């Protein structure tokens, strides 16, 4: 099964997450199929905190990829910000 989830990066105490498409069996920060965007929870004012490639997200959801609950929340947040 293919999932859309967060892959952690950054240093200790300064998290940064890539939004990736990966096989469910692969570890959290392991191999992924495609990177769809990023989420920076510690973004300062004027910095971009969330970016998602909507066209690729639509494609992967269309072929059956399941977003994690957190990614689902971030997708809704990005949609509100864009509107």
From Swiss-Prot:
It comes from the Bacteria. InterPro entries: Ribosomal_bS16, Ribosomal_bS16_dom_sf. Keywords: Ribonucleoprotein, Ribosomal protein. GO terms for cellular component: cytoplasm; small ribosomal subunit. GO terms for molecular function: structural constituent of ribosome. The keyword Ribonucleoprotein applies. It holds the Pfam family Ribosomal_S16. Gene3D superfamilies: 3.30.1320.10. GO terms for biological process: translation. PANTHER family: 30S RIBOSOMAL PROTEIN S16, SMALL RIBOSOMAL SUBUNIT PROTEIN BS16M. Belongs to the bacterial ribosomal protein bS16 family. NCBIfam families: S16 (TIGR00002). This is Small ribosomal subunit protein bS16. The gene is rpsP.
């Amino acid at each position: 099964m293919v999932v859309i989830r967060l892959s952690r990066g950054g240093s200790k105490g300064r998290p940064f997450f890539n939004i990736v498409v990966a096989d469910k069996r692969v570890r959290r920060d392991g191999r992924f199929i495609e990177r769809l965007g990023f989420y920076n929870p510690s973004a300062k004012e004027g910095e971009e905190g969330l970016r998602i490639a909507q066209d690729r997200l639509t494609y992967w959801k269309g072929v059956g990829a399941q977003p994690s609950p957190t990614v689902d929340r971030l997708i809704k947040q990005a949609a509100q910000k864009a509107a």
